Curated annotation (Swiss-Prot):
SUPFAM superfamilies tied to this protein: YcgL-like
Stated name of the protein: YcgL domain-containing protein Mmwyl1_2530
InterPro entries: YcgL-like_sf (IPR038068), YcgL_dom (IPR027354)
Domain of life from the UniProt record: Bacteria
Gene3D superfamilies in the cross-refs: YcgL domain
Residue ranges annotated for the YcgL domain, each copy included: 5-89
Amino acid sequence: MKQHLIVEVFRSSKHDGMYLYVEKSKGLKEIPEELMTRFGKGISAMTMLLTNESKLARATPENVTKGIREKGFYLQLPPAKDEYLLDLYKTPTEAVY
């Protein structure tokens, strides 16, 4: 079964890599206030026709469609930071010889 949905993708003004997918016709009107407080001002990143064949960077079209149909939105969180990479930028606290 083919499903088509016109979605608007907003990026967060507070968190890099956080995106909110919503149905274009509804926009951000029905997003819970608590989520919008944490998300910040939604900055429109793109509008797209979402189908089961769509290619998305860090989500599947099925999950995005399901989230929008059930909750009115799909929240894509930033990727987890690799702890090893974070350690490269820490100031050493003990001498290593």
